[in-house]
Amino acid sequence: MSKEAYFSGESIQLSDMLRAREERALRQLHLLKEYPEGSLLSVTMNIPGPIKTSPKLLEAFDIVIKAIQTALADDKICYQLRLLPTTGYEYYLITSLPSRDLKLKMIALETELPIGRLMDLDVLVLQNDLPHSISRTVLGGSPRQCFICSKEAKVCGRLRKHSVEEMQTAISKLLHSFFNKDNQSSSSDKTG
């Protein structure tokens, strides 16, 4: 499948992204204040470039959301919200699970799911009356790796080490491999 199959959505402007980030931060703050006893999970996708949505990206997003819901099946979920703006898909969940435990489950999910690397599974807490993300490194996890060179993703991002084209190609290959593997296992389940 071509790269265009995964990046076929509407192109957005930087101003749209900045507005979406601001709205997301306000939504996170509101949820943390509305559910002070709960833990907040905020899910977005790591999609470089001006196209953040497409049918295939939504399919991948929804697979991860379903995996999250399955991972938290034994925990009380107080609130869920799934948003599909052109600036990128968003999912919010409040659970009674302590934030540290929630983050550990999300790190495991990011690691176990081949497409988990495409997601930001942020667990947020209020700190000085502002949303603050719990870092995987604080809990003993290793920093996220770059899709392309396997170095620390934040460093590659900060240095703009890889072009949008390179990153989209790597994401397309990852998704193509995931969907083909998923289809093959579904086919063998039906024939076996």
Curated annotation (Swiss-Prot):
Q: Which reaction(s) does the protein catalyse, per the Swiss-Prot or TrEMBL entry?
A: apo-[citrate lyase ACP] + 2'-(5''-triphospho-alpha-D-ribosyl)-3'-dephospho-CoA = holo-[citrate lyase ACP] + diphosphate
Assigned keywords, A-Z: Nucleotidyltransferase, Transferase
Any matching Pfam family: CitX
Q: Name one GO biological process term.
A: prosthetic group biosynthetic process
Q: Which domain of life is it from?
A: Bacteria
EC number(s): the record gives: 2.7.7.61
Q: Nucleotidyltransferase: present as a keyword of the record?
A: yes
Please verify whether the record's keywords include Nucleotidyltransferase.
yes
What InterPro entries does UniProt report for this protein, alphabetically? CitX
One MF term in the entry's GO annotations: holo-citrate lyase synthase activity
NCBIfam families in UniProt: citrate_citX, PRK01392.1
State the family named in the UniProt similarity comment for this chain.
Answer: Belongs to the CitX family.
Known role:
Transfers 2-(5''-triphosphoribosyl)-3'-dephosphocoenzyme-A on a serine residue to the apo-acyl carrier protein (gamma chain) of the citrate lyase to yield holo-acyl carrier protein.
The protein here is known as Probable apo-citrate lyase phosphoribosyl-dephospho-CoA transferase
Question: To which species is this protein native?
Answer: Streptococcus pyogenes serotype M5 (strain Manfredo)
What's the name of its gene?
citX
